[in-house]
Amino acid sequence: MKRYAIYGAGSLGTVLGAYITKSGEKIDLINRNKAHIEALKKNGAKITGAVEMTVPVTALTPDEMSGKYDVILLLTKQLLNAEVVSFLKDFLAEDGVIVTLQNGLPEPGIAEIVGSHRTMGCVVEWGAALVSPGVCELTSKADSLSFHMGKMEGISDAKFAEVKALLERMCPVHEETNLIGARWSKLLINATFSGLGTVVGGVFGDVSESKAARKVAIRCMKECIDVGHAAGAEFAPVQGKNITALFYYKTAFKRALATMLIPIAMKKHRSIEPSMLQDLKKGKPCEIDAINGIVCHFGKACGVKTPINDRIVEIVKKCESGALTPCAENIKLFDDLL
């Protein structure tokens, strides 16, 4: 019998695990958060928001793991990858794979530890939030859920089909031949709306529906596109939309037009609370270096200036240290860059 696990079953992983379990497939939900795991064991996974359901699930802490898994869906913070992936390597079946559903560009680092033939990447195009132990909110509209999945060299067609079928128990899975392009497209969305959402202390809609924030957002998008292109990436469509055609500009007129499109494009995802903001609220370090920070990193390497992303990193790090608090007033900290 095949064995499946979600490692780092927080908000996204609990929602995904509930869908997969409800469909009749067995999967272990694993998290270091003992209160969350105990609540899942006692009450099942309660999902609110775009859907309402409570599903009995199999939940474990890492010290309760045993045996080998054929597929491990990885949803921990990328900050911990070296430690986590090295730990998971011992629980991976000989032909098993780690499928990273994380933000940023995580595949190369994982492949260094377990091999490219055991590494797959998946872009998550929906959001969720942990409300309380055992309770998660699906914050994207139910008709806008999807995955974009690609594979690295050495993954068999059979293994790819197996993972695809597993994830399709929740929502459509698009086979992505341009995984790097899909990663950069998701990075653009995260850098803009998770980055700025964290700065202003709000959900994606607080960025997309604010005139002041949109002025910053469109410039953040352009920086991401410029850097991605300089790094050799061809941006993949996001849920059928060509984001470079929609949001890239070279003239003030196109910039104004693209800015107007932001709230329309983000309408179905307006309620997503940035995972970085969720981390700050819990007093945890966030993934700013793996999101906006990676844009800045590639910008420097490719000779592309990234003043908006640099400022987002600076502000979020100040929020981490307590020197600043995420709030709407923080958008004024970009005025000198506009």
Segments the model singles out, each with a brief description of its role:
Residues E52-E137:
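Rossmann-like NAD(P)(H) cofactor-binding subdomain of soluble oxidoreductases
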Residues K2-R3, D70, L145:
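Nucleotide donor/acceptor-binding cores
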Residues A35-A39, E107-G109, D157-A158:
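Short, charged/polar "capping" segments at the starts of alpha-helices
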Residues I6, I30, L74, T100-L101, ...:
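Active-site-adjacent beta-strand anchor residues
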Residues K2, I218-L338:
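NAD(P)-dependent Rossmann-like dehydrogenase/reductase catalytic/cofactor-binding core
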